[in-house]
Amino acid sequence: MAHGEPYYSSKPDKDFNFGSTMARRQMTPTMVTKLPKFVRNSPQVYDWIVRGLIFPTTGKTYFQRVVVITGGFEDGTYGSFAFDGREWVEIYPIEHLNLMSSLKLIHKANALQERLRLSQEEKATLTLDVQFLQHENVRLKELISKPEPRKIQMKWIIVGAVLTFLSLIPGGYAQSQTNNTIFTDVIAACKYSTETLTENLDLRIKLALANITISDKLDAVRQILNFAFVPRSHWLRTVFYYIHYYEMWNIFMFVLAIGTVMRSTRPGTDLITLATSHLSGFRMAVLPTIPFHTTMTLWVMNTLMVCYYFDNLLAITMAILAPILGIIFLCFMEDSNYVSQIRGLIATAVLIAGGHACLTLTGTTTSLFVVILTCRFVRMATIFIGTRFEIRDANGKVVATVPTRIKNAAFDFFQRLKQSGVRVGVNEFVVIKPGALCVIDTPEGKGTGFFSGNDIVTAAHVVGNNTFVNVCYEGLMYEAKVRYMPEKDIAFITCPGDLHPTARLKLSKNPDYSCVTVMAYVNEDLVVSTAAAMVHGNTLSYAVRTQDGMSGAPVCDKYGRVLAVHQTNTGYTGGAVIIDPADFHPVKAPSQVELLKEEIERLKAQLNSAAENPSTVITQQPTATLEQKSVNDSDVVDLVRTAMEREMKILRDEINGILAPFLQKKKGKTKHGRGRVRRNLRKGVKLLTEEEYRELLEKGLDRETFLDLIDRIIGERSGYPDYDDEDYYDEDDDGWGMVGDDVEFDYTEVINFDQAKPTPAPRTTKPKPCPEPEAETQPLDLSQKKDKQLEHEQQVVKPTKPQKNDPQPYSQTYGKAPIWESYDFDWDEDDAKFILPAPPRLTKADEIVLGSKIVKLRTIIETAIKTQNYSALPEAVFELDKAAYEAGLEGFLQRVKSKNKAPKKLQRAPEDQGAQNYHSLDAWKSLLEPPRERRCVPANFPLLGHLPIDRPIFDDKKPRDDLLGLLPEPTWHAFEEYGPTTWGPQAFIKSFDKFFYAEPIDFFSEYPQLCAFADWATYREFRYLEDTRVIHITATEKNTDSTPAYPKMNYFDTEEKYLESYGWAPYIREFTRVFKGDKPEVLWYLFLKKEIIKEEKIRNSDIRQIVCADPIYTRIGACLEAHQNALMKQHTETSVGQCGWSPMEGGFKKTMQRLVNKGNKYFIEFDWTRYDGTIPPSLFRHIKEIRWNFINKDQREKYRHVHEWYVDNLLNRHVLLPSGEVTLQTRGNPSGQFSTTMDNNMINFWLQAFEFAYFNGPNKDLWKTYDTVVYGDDRLSTTPSVPENYEERVIDMYRDIFGMWVKPGKVICRESIVGLSFCGFTVNADLEPVPTSPEKLMASLLKPYKILPDLESLHGKLLCYQLLAAFMAEDHPFKVYVEHCLSRTAKQLRDSGLPARLTEEQLHRIWRGGPKKCDG
């Protein structure tokens, strides 16, 4: 092939075409056969080099040329080979930078392909294993023998026997016989009528004269108890006529026997006990002694009762001897069993002896029954004696809002900065040396360095804890060692011997800080910025647009001499640490001998001074050395806060002085027009919404939310003003006045509920070649409506900002630019048909601008439908929408999404179905079918029927997110005990256990005084709800992305779709229907929650259930309670309920400080189990009644029947399960109602007030010394004192009175608030929040229940975790792992808008609302 066609080993080799083409032409078949084993499908570099430069050669052969080939190997190395005429000989490798970069990418691609191949093989193997296991499972099931079911169940035989036994019980009474005739019956009837008429006349006269006495009232009650109101010929009279022949014990025994047969696990033992109780005559007295018995003592009692039936004296003797014999002969048992057996024998002796005495004296055992019950009650009541208590909870998920803050100096500073305008002036030319810069690459990220002397200087935080770093200079990578890091944020790296920079920087001998220059490499581009600097001690500050990767850059004067090292990265304000010649060399530390000598001399001086003046020694004892050795974390925090306070004060003073000329108020200008600056615009604005904060704890925030969060921080610092537009929304007008009681709506009128509200300043983006729509919304564009000063500002920035004047043709764009990810999905025939509208529906602009492209796309669509191959559609539609965007038209994919058509794969609403069967609240009743198989409803709940629904009851999905392959392997494995929930039918059944623990008593009757005190405390605490209003249903707000329940969920996946289709008419119609007196029964939909929980709970099928109601029903609840809920959120800082609480911007510390400032000695953290489900229904209804009493008096009476209907449907819920089963729930506070959290807060507080009165009595003065914060079932309290055995007593009280569950260990009482938890955060020494369960957060990252859409989402989630871990220990495994993951994902992002990581200053602004201060 010499002098023939060039040789290429593969297609990539031909594409790259590295090296000499002449060398490729010299390749012969022998040379090709003997080629080294380079990487398959990789490029090589061919060189044609003089032979004498490679092989030792003399004579004419010196100038002959040989072929040299350079390529890469499988192990990641590369080499060069020369052909000596016979074979390829390896020579010293020749460096080719382009080849090295290409080989690196090829190796990475090959590694990914190999990983994909292994994953596919593993998947195929696992699939085959699953099939084998399925076949084996079927085979084993066939081998299991199925027992023949009994033809007649044994329990029915037992029931028949019991019924026969009870029917033969003698129960007659001897009565006198009377002879009656028809005349005597007529006389008796007339007499009864006359007496009844006389009584009625007397009663009416007394009513007319209002002369009702107490005896009359007692007679009325007596008549009611005697059923005197029942007519003589009523069927109840007949029932009572036959029942009175039986004693009460017989009836009770009959009912108890039936219940025993149906539900008892030991029906034989229970029935024998009933029979022996009846035969012996002890009857009711036996029942209260049952809990004292064991199995053995129960049979002893049954035997003695049978013996008593035949010989009572023998039975009494044996009963008295039984405890004595038991004490002797059962002493071999362990203590717990021994005590239980003896207690049962003593109970037996008391029953036999006492029962015999009662039967002998009175003929019945009723008195013994009363005595035993009284003893049990006294024993139970003595457990709850206590003095004081306070309770606090810890593990809730909180929704965040920003607290209202008063106007202060810092706020005025930012507002003055907004009014100041931009700087003007002319900067001089500066000297820069790009050849003196390099890039420092570490596993944690990249930074900038510069050459000075024999060292490479950079920032210490760029180097981190690494001993060796990679230095990238002019495309080559060198490994260098970190030489020295002083106390400043500076690091000195030894320059490698083979690195020869073209320029070096020198230190400035006469520093001039008036104007500084910062130069650095950002994304391989050199960036330079000049600014005026301010000196603050050993640091500089200047206003530059700092970017990631600039840390460590040199800060030079105008002559190019180094002044400082750039270190701060907050996005706007830059900072640097001044570098001195003394920083280059470490200070020699004194030897150990010298240190010991100094220590001895210092101790001698202290001894001498102590003898002369002891007080002086005490005050002057600490020295510099000891101070450094005794510094703790709190001291460091205080020092940093002091430094930040001093820096901010200096910075504010300097800026105010510079901006003073611009702050003069012009004459004749009131500045109250539409363009005025709203100083209190951020007052009351949420940093995060409640839903977003809850997501933050579980799964992080999305990209847009994080960008808005960072924009708010930057906006505060950069000082862009917010402007009022023409439709400015007055925040003082809360809208309550528009919803009067008698407002009538015309349903035919189209009502526009949109309201213009102020929008934040737009985000500043990089300049683009063509004007973007963001340019039209920049704050400077609105400055034409300002005064002359702002017009001058606009002229200053004119060269750097796009102008609105003279737009070019088609320069405007519609919406956002199309993104390829939105088009890259599996297209089907429906997508292809609906992507383009019919030709008559195209606009004239579409035909003129996009006509040819639309015709081309129609051809592609027709071909795709015929061949059923839609792979070409995404790219074609994307190109069309891209052209439409550039022409200022709406994209066709966006048009399809904006048509509000019914969601895909959902049924359309049946046209023949009436409104009452589709929109009404009880539409489900007409679809209800008879009950069938019970699959997901437990046996102790009724099965009302089945509804046609297509929903899965199995979920075994554990997604595998490929993006997690970018993250490093974790070394901390505590997260493995958590995982995403999966379930089957058993999980639905077990989820109903949340409603059961213990049965509550009638505490309103048993403890009326304590309940009255709890009511007083609740009315006092929530008195700000007085005179709240019912609002109109169209003015309510709720989450419209929720499931609209059945049957609307068959046709719409969200309430938003339902509202778009039908508007407010169904809502108003159903509200009017209820208002007129109708009481429809609402259907709730139940589903299990997909979340991260412990694997043990998943194995036990312990998954939380969620119920949601019809959106119309929820909106009606919002009408009644939205005003109160809004007020509760506004009073978060002063009230106990933290429904509007936010841990951000100092909210957490302010809340904790509130409890600490109370001055009490103890702090209590309290936590319930199954709180929502075990709330007593009577208490829940009572709290709802308290809330309703706060409503305006007129509206309270007008809408009372609506409120009663609403609460009835909360407590008696008809629930639909995904299996189609319909059941009834009558317990707990449903999680899907409109005011779940607010109701839980009030119940939590009411229970605490009840506990206080229970332990301390209704002491109102003492109650005022307590303070508490609650959120749902979370509670954190402070109290002056705590009684002994507080934990045991309060646990027993909740179980026995309210039937609520508090586990041991969930009540924590300490003398310090540090270490206690509230809403998922643990309080540290600085009252800052630390995540209580970081292992759960790590599980949600590495074992998610939902795959993240893209890399930006993963990076945003990591930023959320960095935010949550802000106050964790620096060496905590979770925090270290998050930082490591951020360094990985930041390298893969390109122009995403998200920061590589949140800086320390940004974290402080988010958590504290500003820089770290000395006062916290």
From Swiss-Prot:
Compositional bias ranges of the Basic and acidic residues kind: 783-795
Originating species: Human astrovirus-5
Mod. after translation: Cleaved by the viral and host proteases. The protease is probably autocatalytically cleaved.
Origin: domain of life: Viruses
Lineage: Viruses, Riboviria, Orthornavirae, Pisuviricota, Stelpaviricetes
Name this protein carries in UniProt: Non-structural polyprotein 1AB
Enzyme active site: 461, 489, 551
Family affiliation: Belongs to the astroviridae polyprotein 1AB family.
Regions that span the bilayer: 154-174, 239-259, 286-306, 313-333, 344-364
Coiled-coil boundaries: 104-146, 587-614
